[in-house]
Design a protein with these regions (language model features):
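Active-site-adjacent loops and short helices of periplasmic peptidoglycan-processing enzymes
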Residues: 2-23, 27-212, 216-221, 225
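Domain-terminus/edge residues, biased toward the C-terminal soluble/receptor-binding domains
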Residues: 192, 203-213, 218-415
């Protein structure tokens, strides 16, 4: 992957939070949830809009809008436009639940920019791995072996390796320092449902997040070129044991995000570009994904579906993405994904430079799609070419009609 001439942070945001008090929530009759499903027992946050703090399904269908998918069993879910920030529909969006490894999105968004360059190496010590929880998902890091930062991030995103998380945390300054930085960053993103106890999402008492917060983490992380690359990579080679006098071995690792790699009973999702899945005993299955179709980019998060169907979290996420692409422009948003606290709302419309950059992005994305672009047969989020988007000084968020997420390479359809 060519080195970027300049790290570009996209800083154009969604519309301002709605301050209007809306009418009662509309749960589509064809999308009723099981009455026996667990429900939030207390009040929920209203960050992003009052309706997002209401219990149950929130959706307001307009003329021609499709009904929500049937048999959605997630305790909490949300589907939103990644660019405008509009929440198209949600269900218990601010319910504070165990996040499992989807919390690694916050870890990466916090730590990744600080551990540069990614060619930097680290010799793993026993102390680096001492805090890895029993039964953790692992990529296979060995003590007294050397790894690059790039290797470690592949281990985090593809194999959800808690061992890789702990080594990176050690490089960052230690687990307590990392946890404190993650909590601070969550608050900066206005992800106020989140309480961080461990950097890897391992089950700990009081470690919680929400579908809304996880979506904020994904949206923020996707502004970083390395984050986009790692979260969308399907397979990679990971360093193995270094034997004296021999070339170091490697082994292949595969992304556990089944909407990228597919599996029995679940196909790769057309247009998928990440982000992260997770599972623990207390969290159940959790998933946040981003996908593009016909120039529109959607984010979806599903937490702890009760369905016993294999890969239910992916199937429900895919059905919500399908619905979102069909419903876009035909529903009244029920809330917004908020900008970071440090962002200063700007005024007016997009600058000429920003508009020109957007057109260039769209043209390039169209060329990639037409050519069936891929990287080792997988879909991968593109780097921003230096100067393609305008870097706005001072962290200014422009309140515009669009929030230009960098273009995403479309998956080449599998035969």
């Amino acid at each position: 992957m060519p080195a970027l001439k300049k790290t570009v942070l996209t800083v154009i945001s969604a519309a301002l939070l709605s301050s209007l008090v809306v009418g009662p929530a509309f749960a589509d009759d064809k999308a009723k949830t099981d009455d026996n499903q667990p429900r939030p027992t207390g009040p929920m946050s209203t960050v992003g809009g009052k309706r997002l703090g209401l219990i149950g399904t929130q959706v307001e269908l307009g003329p021609g809008a499709p009904a929500l998918p049937k048999h959605l069993t997630g305790r909490s879910w949300i589907v939103a436009d990644a660019e405008s920030g509009q929440v198209l529909a949600s269900h218990n969006a601010h319910w504070r639940l165990p996040p499992a490894s989807t919390l690694k999105m916050l870890f990466a968004d916090t730590v990744l920019p600080k551990l540069q360059p990614r060619t930097m190496t680290h010799l793993v010590t026993p102390e680096d791995l001492a805090g890895v929880g029993e039964g953790s998902s692992l990529v296979g890091i060995k003590e007294n072996e050397t790894y690059t930062v790039h290797d470690l991030w592949l281990g985090v995103f593809l194999r959800s390796g808690n061992d890789a998380v702990h080594v990176l945390s050690s490089m960052y300054g230690g687990v307590p320092t990392t946890v404190a930085a993650m909590q601070k960053h969550a608050e900066e993103l206005q992800a106020l449902d989140t309480h961080v106890v461990s950097p890897d999402g391992y089950d700990f008492p009081k470690q919680v997040s929400s579908a809304y917060d996880l979506t904020l983490f994904a949206r923020s992380g996707l502004q970083k070129a390395d984050f986009r690359e790692y979260c969308s990579t399907a397979t990679a080679e990971f360093p193995g044991e270094q034997k004296k006098g021999k070339k170091r071995e490697s082994f292949q690792i595969q992304n556990t995000n089944r909407l990228i790699t597919g599996d029995i009973g679940v196909d790769p999702y057309k247009g998928i570009a990440g982000v992260k899945n997770g599972y623990t005993t207390h969290a159940g299955n959790t998933f946040t994904g981003v996908a593009e179709r016909n120039g529109r980019v959607l984010l979806v998060t599903v937490m702890n579906p009760s369905s016993e169907e294999s890969h239910a979290v992916y199937k429900e996420a895919a059905s919500l993405l399908d619905w979102g692409f069909s419903a876009s422009g035909k529903v009244t948003p029920v809330g917004d994904l908020v900008p970071p606290l440090s962002a200063t709302p700007g005024k007016g419309s997009e600058s000429a430079d920003a508009e020109a950059a957007r057109k260039k992005v769209a043209a390039k994305a169209g060329t990639v799609a037409a050519n069936g672009g891929s990287h080792a047969g997988i879909g991968i989020a593109l780097s921003i070419v230096g100067g393609l988007l305008v870097l706005l000084a001072g962290g200014v968020f422009l309140i515009n009609r669009r929030w230009p997420l960098p273009d995403l390479v479309r998956r080449r359809p599998r035969a």
